Design a protein with these regions (language model features):
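Structural alpha/beta core scaffold segments of enzyme domains
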Residues: 1-362
């Protein structure tokens, strides 16, 4: 077929679906409780796994004495993983209570003294000593800072954040007859299939992903390296051909997430005697975040830089991505500039959105 050079678009008067209300097909099942989430999966002969990971990120399992757990009713096996230990039993409660009876020894990888507060202080100190990588520059910020009638500075910091999904991490995996199947709720089924294939050694074409609705995702249910999908796969390999459901406890879920990055930022700015913003200098820790770190407003002199810093704490996707941190940084400092200019923050914004009519309308 020859594609048309100028395809004719359907006239709005001929629309039959666009612009009409449509109800989600899954709403009734979610309302009446019949929707099947990953935690609801039940398979014939299914076993249950409970898991304890190293209390320090990066720590490895050194040893575990399994006899106490194995002596409990329903317990089938204690499975040792690189950075965790799991108990497999006939029911989740049996697995969880047997897990509590274990006293595994984990290494700390040298991170036992790490604290979020100390990491935040280190970020702030680094911002005072390092210039960083250029993200965005326009005009002459140094000259504008001298020229301004009032100059201000501000430091901001935001912590690691836990996704707090209503449904904890959960997956059921079956390895049998040269095939792998996984029942879970993820935001990237294809990457999940690749993860299961890599861990199990089974070709991806022989891996089936049964993707269920998830009880909250917000970026947390991306299949990340070393996460629950890989753990469930390794446990199922040890128990093949029986299907095994791994469900994290809430405590495990809080302690071993892939968190929104902790970020610190430092700003300098200046306003003119007429109350207009003249200069904006921003530095922040972490990778370049592009538009998220740039103010929307008409500031003639800007210098925005990122200072790469990375801790051992697992970081993952977060809903709204970098705007979660930088939206707060940018708008809070713009409020500070408005205060320095003696102008109402709303009026200050409207006055400096001249080339952004869409934003002015909002």
């Amino acid at each position: 077929l020859e594609p048309p050079q100028r395809p004719a678009l359907k006239a709005p008067t001929d629309y039959r679906i666009v612009g009409t209300p449509r109800h989600r097909l899954d709403v009734p099942a979610k309302v009446d409780g019949t929707a099947v989430y990953a935690v609801d999966v039940r398979l014939p002969g299914m076993l249950h796994a409970a898991l304890m990971a190293a209390p320090v990120f990066g720590g490895r399992l050194e040893s575990v004495e399994s006899a106490t757990a194995m002596a409990r009713a329903g317990v089938k096996r204690v499975v040792e993983l690189e950075q965790a230990v799991a108990v497999v039993a006939e029911t989740h409660w049996q697995a969880q209570t047997a897990l509590a009876a274990l006293s595994p020894r984990f290494g700390t990888a040298g991170h036992e003294s790490f604290t979020s507060a100390a990491w935040s202080d280190q970020q702030q100190q680094t911002l005072r000593t390092e210039r960083g990588d250029n993200d965005h520059s326009v005009g002459d910020v140094d000259a504008a800072l001298v020229e301004g009638s009032r100059r201000i500075e501000a430091d901001y910091r935001v912590p690691y954040l836990y996704h707090a999904t209503m449904e904890p991490m959960c997956a059921t995996v079956r390895i049998a007859d040269g095939r792998a199947e996984i029942w879970t709720g993820v935001q990237d089924p294809l990457q999940t299939r690749r993860r299961v294939a890599k861990v199990s050694g089974i070709d991806a074409e022989r891996v089936t992903v049964h993707n269920h609705p998830s009880g909250g995702g917000f970026g947390r249910r991306m299949p990340l390296e070393g996460d629950y999908v890989e753990q469930a796969t390794r446990i199922a390999m040890a128990m093949a051909p029986a299907p095994v459901k791994l469900m994290w406890s809430r405590e495990q879920d809080v302690r071993h997430g892939f968190y929104r990055p902790a970020v610190s930022a430092r700003f300098e700015g200046a306003v003119s005697a007429a109350g207009a913003p003249l200069a904006w200098r921003g530095r922040f820790t972490g990778r370049s975040e592009g538009a998220a770190a740039r103010p929307l407003y008409g500031i003639p002199n800007q210098d925005i830089r990122s200072v790469p810093m990375q801790s051992h704490v697992p970081e993952g996707p977060w809903r709204s991505v970098a705007f979660s941190q930088h939206g707060f940084f940018v708008e809070a400092f713009f409020d500070e500039l408005a205060e320095a200019a003696g102008v109402d923050p709303f009026e200050f914004r409207v006055a400096n959105l001249g080339d952004r009519p869409r934003h002015r309308a909002v």
